[in-house]
Amino acid sequence: AATGATPSWDDPATQEVFEAIAHDVEASVSAAPPLLPGALRITSALSEVGLAQAIVSASPRRIVEKVASALGDVFTVLVTGDDGVGAKPDPLPYATAVERLDLQPQDCVVVEDSPTGAASARGNGIHVVQIGAQKHFPADPGLVVVPDLASITPHLLLWAQR
């Protein structure tokens, strides 16, 4: 029964459930991770013009590495749930990525598909291109909302960074 209580990550039962889910996800992405339409195109285009890219995810590193590989291994930095830097919307995951990229937040643009991820990036002053025009997002001059990844171009990312 649902209690409304937040599970503790220190609880062995919570860890067991998380590991079971991670195992199922890993099995499903092993052969060919399902990529959102436009993901490979945009990561390839950014790589071709020499822009550093990072993935920031709460997923285990082994899963993130498989997705990164499917996207062409163009990512300089992977920040994963295994890094112990907290979870979105905490700003620390994106702060860690910016630090590892040796950049400043104002020099970065984040593409996010979740409101908690957008909040994490915005907590560092990073501009965000948010996927999902049908969702509700607070008015924020640092947030651009597009319907899907296919709508993103390198020019949009440069404009969003302004």
Regions from the language model: what does each represent?
Residues A1-G4, Q53-V56, A70-L71:
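N-terminal-biased segments
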Residues A2-R41, V49:
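Metal-dependent phosphoesterase signature
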Residues A31, V56, G86:
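Glycine- and other small-residue-rich loops at beta-strand/loop junctions that grip anionic moieties
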Residues P33, I55, D107-V109:
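Residue-level marker of alpha-helix boundaries and capping positions
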Residues S44-S47, L51, P60-R162:
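Asp-based, Mg2+/Mn2+-dependent phosphohydrolase catalytic module
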